[in-house]
């Protein structure tokens, strides 16, 4: 690996990994479950990189030995040919491993491990936009199921002709944000609505916002900025229906964000859920501000995740989904059934390549 700065990074990672391994064996850490889990997670995050680095070191030593054998076998054609084949094989494996190591050393998004709030809003297109928003709720729910994630509908505003004016899903599981963060933006659909007698194709949109869940300590909310009212809500049945004010209407004055929660059975639970959604929305605003500062220096080829950015078109006539950031097409029927993994992996790969290009430019 010619890049000295990458070798230096790998040595630093190895030293940190060794120190974390030592700390796990420390009796003082072992008796503190919170600290032990924190150290264990930090160590686990570095393990793949360290193992790949050790494999790279081993392959390089094997390459040195193969070259020495090739040099010493000047008068033995068969042995010399074997050494040449081994040198070519090892060189190829080392080159592949170096590319993998470069990706492993890219800065990690601190939000990648987090659960998310996924907000889907009907956009342009009238009733059809609400129906389309409902289709997206179904698509993401199906994708989450393939990943083994848990999905809960935490807030909804139903559209008159079906679907949603707005829906917020809470999605919990392993590294949810790391994959779904690429879904933020405008999703456009081109199809013939069921109500269209003439068979004319309509274009409608829905906006997706992906918000990592945050703790109270990460986002401060001034109580003076909140207006909170309650209302009666139809529940799951029984005496509480329309008699007890369990619904919560929360308004955040500085941003104009309004959240109406009715999904929980108690007013307290709906209040907690409303504040949870508000924290996620405020954190997403902060993230977007940081993102805009970054993209002013580097325009990501994958896209900024801006809500106003059209990221994808779903064309029913041609059974085609076009991701405009990637310039690639995918099967519409597969995607709508929740097969988003090919698109998401392509976004991750493109993002990594863009970061690698920036890193190389900075080192040049």
Swiss-Prot record:
This is Peptide chain release factor 1. Keywords: Cytoplasm, Methylation, Protein biosynthesis. Gene3D superfamilies: 3.30.160.20, 3.30.70.1660, 6.10.140.1950. One of its GO terms (cellular component) is cytoplasm. InterPro entries: PCRF, Pep_chain_release_fac_I, Pep_chain_release_fac_I_sf, Prokaryotic/Mito_RF, RF-1. Its main location: cytoplasm. Peptide chain release factor 1 directs the termination of translation in response to the peptide chain termination codons UAG and UAA. The keyword Cytoplasm applies. Belongs to the prokaryotic/mitochondrial release factor family. Signal peptide: none annotated. Pfam families: PCRF (PF03462), RF-1 (PF00472). Methylated by PrmC. Methylation increases the termination efficiency of RF1. It is found in: Cytoplasm. The modification N5-methylglutamine is found at residue 239. One of its GO terms (molecular function) is translation release factor activity, codon specific. PANTHER family: LD18447P (PTHR43804), PEPTIDE CHAIN RELEASE FACTOR APG3, CHLOROPLASTIC (PTHR43804:SF8). PROSITE patterns: RF_PROK_I.
């Amino acid at each position: 690996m010619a890049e000295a700065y990458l070798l230096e990074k790998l040595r630093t990672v190895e030293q940190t990994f060794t120190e974390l391994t030592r700390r796990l064996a420390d009796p003082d850490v072992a008796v503190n479950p919170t600290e032990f889990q924190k150290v264990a997670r930090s160590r686990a995050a570095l393990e793949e990189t360290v193992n790949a680095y050790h494999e790279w070191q081993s392959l390089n030593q094997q390459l040195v030995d193969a070259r020495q054998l090739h040099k010493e076998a000047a008068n033995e054609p068969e042995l010399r040919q074997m050494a040449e084949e081994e040198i070519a094989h090892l060189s190829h494996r080392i080159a592949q491993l170096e590319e993998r190591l470069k990706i492993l050393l890219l800065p990690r998004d601190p939000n990648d491990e987090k659960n998310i709030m996924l907000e889907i809003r009907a956009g342009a297109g009238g009733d059809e936009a609400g129906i389309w928003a409902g289709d997206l709720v179904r698509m993401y729910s199906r994708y989450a199921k393939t990943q083994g994630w848990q999905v809960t509908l935490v807030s909804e505003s139903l559209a008159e002709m079906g679907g949603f004016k707005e829906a917020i899903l809470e999605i919990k599981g392993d590294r949810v944000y790391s994959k779904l963060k690429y879904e933020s933006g405008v999703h456009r659909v081109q199809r013939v609505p069921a109500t269209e007698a003439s068979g004319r194709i309509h274009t409608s949109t829905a906006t997706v916002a992906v918000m990592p869940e945050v703790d109270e300590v990460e986002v401060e909310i001034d109580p003076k900025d909140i207006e909170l009212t309650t209302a009666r809500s139809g529940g799951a049945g029984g005496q509480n229906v329309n008699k007890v004010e369990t619904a919560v209407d929360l308004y955040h004055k500085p941003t104009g964000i309004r959240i109406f929660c009715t999904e929980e059975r108690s007013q307290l639970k709906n209040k907690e859920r409303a504040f949870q959604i508000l924290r996620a929305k405020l954190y997403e605003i902060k993230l977007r501000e940081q993102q805009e500062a970054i993209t002013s220096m580097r325009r990501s080829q994958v896209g900024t995740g801006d809500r106003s950015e059209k990221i994808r078109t779903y064309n029913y006539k041609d059974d085609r989904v076009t991701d405009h950031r990637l310039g690639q097409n995918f099967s519409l029927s597969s995607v709508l059934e929740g097969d988003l993994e090919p698109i998401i992996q392509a976004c991750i790969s493109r993002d990594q390549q863009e970061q690698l290009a920036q890193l190389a430019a900075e080192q040049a």
